[in-house]
A protein has these predicted regions:
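SAM cofactor-binding core of SAM-dependent methyltransferases
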Residues: 12-128, 141
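Conserved acidic-Pro-Pro-aromatic motif
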Residues: 39-41, 51-66, 77-78, 134-259
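Preference for solvent-exposed, low-hydrophobicity sequence contexts
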Residues: 3-7
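A short acidic, often aromatic-flanked loop/helix-cap motif at beta-alpha or helix-coil junctions
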Residues: 124-129, 203-207
């Protein structure tokens, strides 16, 4: 079972909305923040910006800033080769998969003007030009929606996130290998003004021997900017019609909490 502190605070269901696809890359947020967000910052991009695209449709006035050092020219060359081989081996016959071969065109079209992708690694303290600190990313920005999926490095940037909470309206964060880092997550949840309003187990990474997910997606709301119940949620997770599996060939993970 997951620790009691992993159970979200009570939300009015009509305030919860899913943004992005009904699969991996979609997240549940509080819709009250949408129109108030001025900057959406994504740390960790890979080849998926569907969340950012849909968010921009709802709030066309916000800027999108993405940081990912792995998405470079080499990344796109390798991806195109792989997709092309799959196509000729008849592994990409569905229209969506065929269109994915030309994902780079979508990337070029999306990341322009107010939408920017920086080929930099997100770190606690930068040591060279290829890195950028989370503190610098957040500097001089207000009304932020911060989305973090940096494959285990999220634990290194929790402290500056906690200290700069006043500028962050909503935090979406994926915690990896949670059982090895459970105390770090608990400490962050206890001391942060960003309060947990939603949790989902990412079924891509499977479960441990106790049937708990190895990776969780958490959504946290700034409790000083938005009204939030002091009571814990009574929802069963995953929430029907809000949560969807990341990997369609596996069942979603039912979450259980220590009460």
């Amino acid at each position: 079972m997951l620790p009691k502190i992993f159970k979200p605070y009570k939300s009015i269901k009509k305030n919860l909305i899913r943004v992005g696809p009904n699969t991996d890359g979609g997240y549940v947020i509080d819709k009250r923040v949408i129109k108030k967000v001025k900057t959406l910052i994504s740390c960790g991009l890979n080849d998926d910006w569907e969340f950012e695209k849909e968010f921009l449709k709802i709030n066309p006035y916000c800027e999108i800033l993405a940081y990912d050092h792995t998405v470079n020219k080499k990344f796109w060359k390798n991806r195109f080769k792989k997709d092309l081989i799959s196509f000729f081996l008849l592994k990409k016959l569905r229209l969506r998969k065929i269109l994915n071969i030309f994902k780079y065109i979508d990337y070029i079209n999306f990341f322009k003007k107010n939408n920017k992708h920086y080929i930099k690694k997100v770190v606690l303290k930068s040591k060279n030009k290829k890195e950028i600190s989370i503190k610098k990313i957040l500097k001089n920005k207000k009304n932020i929606l911060l989305k973090i999926d940096i494959e285990g490095d999220e634990y290194k940037v929790l402290e500056p996130i906690k200290k700069n909470f006043q500028h962050i309206y909503l935090l979406i964060i994926e915690f990896h290998n949670i059982h090895k880092n459970i105390d770090k997550i608990k400490k962050f949840l206890m001391k942060s003004k960003l309060k947990l309003i939603h949790i989902h187990g990412n079924n891509y990474s499977g479960i441990n021997k106790n049937k708990d997910p190895n990776v969780v997606e958490m959504t946290m709301l700034n409790s000083e900017k938005f009204k939030l119940s002091k009571n814990k949620s009574k929802f069963k997770y995953p929430i029907k019609d809000l949560d969807y599996v990341n990997f369609k060939r596996r069942n979603d993970i039912e979450l259980r909490f220590n009460d």
